[in-house]
């Protein structure tokens, strides 16, 4: 995870879930985040509670950052692939609520 940002009492406590649907040759991933605002403008700058960006991983490999709640994932080879998203602060620390990283995963099965 690297550096973390433990959410303090009274601060927004982000939650996350994922959904995925076929889209063309690939997939449309929807990130459903509560108490969290995606912000490209402040990425790499100062921390604002409840604000930041996501990191997306497929099969444990980081694909990049998410600055909005939807992303297209290109075609995947046959098999089952785990897609994971973490929520991170503007200054790139991983959000942690009650000792647990704010992350969600979903599997994509390609026949």
Feature-to-residue mapping (PLM):
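Short, compositionally biased P/S/T/A/G/V-rich stretches that sit at domain boundaries
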Residues: 1-23
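Short beta-strand elements
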Residues: 98-111
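Contiguous beta-strand segments within globular domains
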Residues: 21-35
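Short acidic/polar inter-strand loop motif in beta-rich domains
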Residues: 64, 88-97
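Short beta-strand segments within Ig-like beta-sandwich modules, predominantly Fibronectin type-III
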Residues: 61-68
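Short amphipathic, basic-aromatic surface patches that mediate peripheral association
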Residues: 33-46
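Short, well-structured beta-strand segments within conserved domains
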Residues: 27-31, 77-90
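Short beta-strand elements bearing conserved aromatic residues within extracellular beta-rich modules
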Residues: 54-56
